[in-house]
Amino acid sequence: MNPGDMVLVTGGAGYVGSHLVRMLLAKGYRVRVLDCFLYGDMGLKECYSNPRLEVVRGDICNIRDLIRCMRGVSAVIALAALVGDAACELDQEETLAINVESTKLLSQVVRLAPEVKRVVFASSCSVFGANVGLVLNEGSVLNPVSFYARSRIVSEGILNSELEDCSVVTLRLGTVFGTSPRMRLDLMVNTMTARALSGGKVTVMGGEAWRPHVHVQDVARAFLTAAEAPSEEVSGEIFNVGGNSQNHTVGETADIVAAALPDLGIAVEHVAAVDDLRSYKVSFDKIEYVLKFKPKYSVQRGVEQLRGLLSGGALEVDDPVYSNLIYLRQYGFGGKRVDLEGENEGRKEIAESA
């Protein structure tokens, strides 16, 4: 992939995508974004005047939209998905269509577009699920505990089995945090910081579970790195995205948030654990060794950025748009579900991967 090439970013107006689109444009790429703007278009508004950006309001579940967007494309970065365990449980039919059936459509369309040489797919470290006492690498046994995680596993398999003649790279993202043009306040570090600033304390439920944190700008940079890497280094490969030093328990994360706001005297309150089996401590040796990728942003630095944004009054923190779960509960899915052939088969694949 070279500057001047056309890159298709599905979900390019989202939390990660709005950073990635800016990075691609800054490096001289032409960028086509396919997004349904379920949460609005605030993530891209500042970029609309860039002549190398083309924005298509469309649906990854619509094969016509995918075919139209694939023309002249050298690489696809597939970010569009319904994200989050709780959000995906609201309607498993919607989740199946958006997260799995759309992946099947994408693979079909890419097979018809020989000029597409690279597909980079956004998966999640949540596929590791409940794995206590282990440091998990890309070859570790998966133990998903949510429909969202199972949908990611099935989609990984679809792309790698259906696109044998295309260079497919899978990125399993850690627990993302940090500021973004399309802001989210429903992610662990972001939520803790917002509550600390508004209420003077962080409440920790349990606290022993592990999470691998990674800043949203580092995630966007990882996608750019994977898209540009030589095929012999990345084709067919899976990379966990994050840094070893940013594996923290939930309790440690709360302490870091409080320590990053020293003048506010933030209290950390521990209460009984909730019914959440997820715990995964992840190795990021592979991405550092193969792609020379290391995160630039610590959790503390991310909290400081969040404070600057939230204290400035630029956001109404109670606006549902900053929480995928609350927004979808209030406004629904915007009629995105489609009745696609193979839906029952896809649901069976998800169930069997549990």
Language-model regions, residue ranges each:
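Conserved Rossmann-fold NAD(P)-dependent oxidoreductase catalytic core, especially the SDR/UDP-sugar
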Residues: A78, K104-F147
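NAD(P)H-binding glycine-rich loop region in Rossmannoid oxidoreductase-like domains
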Residues: I60-I98
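Active-site Tyr-X1-5-Lys
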Residues: A130-V132, N143-V169, L197
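Short alpha-helix in the Rossmann-fold core of NAD(P)-dependent oxidoreductases
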Residues: A81, D91, I98-T103, V120-S123, ...
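Flexible, glycine-rich beta-alpha linker
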Residues: F128-G129, S146-F147, L171-L187
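N-terminal Rossmann/SDR dinucleotide-binding element
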Residues: M1-A75
